[in-house]
Amino acid sequence: MNGTEGPNFYVPMSNATGVVRSPFEYPQYYLAEPWAFSILAAYMFFLIITGFPINFLTLYVTIEHKKLRTPLNYILLNLAVADLFMVFGGFTTTMYTSMHGYFVFGETGCNLEGYFATLGGEISLWSLVVLAIERWVVVCKPISNFRFGENHAIMGLTLTWVMANACAMPPLFGWSRYIPEGLQCSCGIDYYTLKPEVNNESFVIYMFLVHFTIPLTIISFCYGRLVCAVKEAAAQQQESETTQRAEREVTRMVVIMVISFLVCWIPYASVAWYIFTHQGSTFGPIFMTVPSFFAKSSSIYNPMIYICMNKQFRNCMITTLFCGKNPFEGEEEGSTTKTEASAVSSVSPA
């Protein structure tokens, strides 16, 4: 084995020289220079000071403006809640441990940090699944006269939390485990060992199949059908120009969210799967650290996309920030008229 396995950790470095120590007890400066840990801490600080205000603002603006409380926006707000879980439950912990060079909070802290990070990522993924299904149903209309309402949104929210916890909670109760990864300052699922005592192999396969492959398959199917439907509608002019434009804008926003999610998480998932399927292979701590910390950036892109591409929300956010006034109102009125994204979910067949 090219790493060192302990009772509750796996350090990607051979202990032939005897320098490897538990990441719960000693600084891991033999894995990288201290400045590398400082960079990680600074990066996490950046994610905290950007991720918290932008996600909190998304929630606050929606609560402040009643017209934003639409079924589709429930799902988008769910993404903001998931991101806040990651910020408070994961990023603050990782920043502090990176400053010390090892996971100072012990096994319990590792479990909590791993749980919140996994929960946030899975809520985001399953929220995108619900959004993809909503887009497919609204645009492709497999069910005539269907309108995505509040009850459907609540069912979608329930699905995201049930499925996310079905992935994040088992390691807390003995099916797999959370251990420090990369530079040993953040925690995640144990992809590094088979660990038969906790049936680790079966959990990793379950997670990749049920909580990664299946969601991506559903998303791919929905958007494959959606692209065809949009082209057909444009060719046949079955909908009014305003309706088609609104549907295209919401669809474009959700597609960009999906692409951004894949850009952030595919590298991490690919590296994790490689490590799992190549047990004992040689890899350095940076090999897992970079994609792991890059995936954490997903906490800031969803609200950014939402703010940039949803004119109605953007206007409400500006009026909130400027105490009820919109200094850019003249520019907004002079721009091309766009139908608000949040209203599209209630578009009925023509």
Curated annotation (Swiss-Prot):
Q: Which GO terms describe its molecular function?
A: G protein-coupled receptor activity; photoreceptor activity
This protein's source sits in the domain of life called Eukaryota
Gene Ontology cellular component annotations, sorted alphabetically: membrane
**Residue intervals annotated with topology Extracellular:** 1-36, 99-113, 177-202, 277-284
UniProt note on tissues of expression? Rod shaped photoreceptor cells which mediates vision in dim light.
Spans annotated as Disordered: 330-350
Which GO BP terms sit in this record? phototransduction; visual perception
Where does the record say carbohydrate is attached? 2, 15, 200
Q: Transmembrane residues, as ranges?
A: 37-61, 74-98, 114-133, 153-176, 203-230, 253-276, 285-309
Bilayer topology reads:
Multi-pass membrane protein
Q: Which residues are annotated with the PTM N6-(retinylidene)lysine?
A: 296
Purpose: Visual pigments are the light-absorbing molecules that mediate vision. They consist of an apoprotein, opsin, covalently linked to cis-retinal.
Protein family: Belongs to the G-protein coupled receptor 1 family. Opsin subfamily.
What is the designated name of this protein? Blue-sensitive opsin
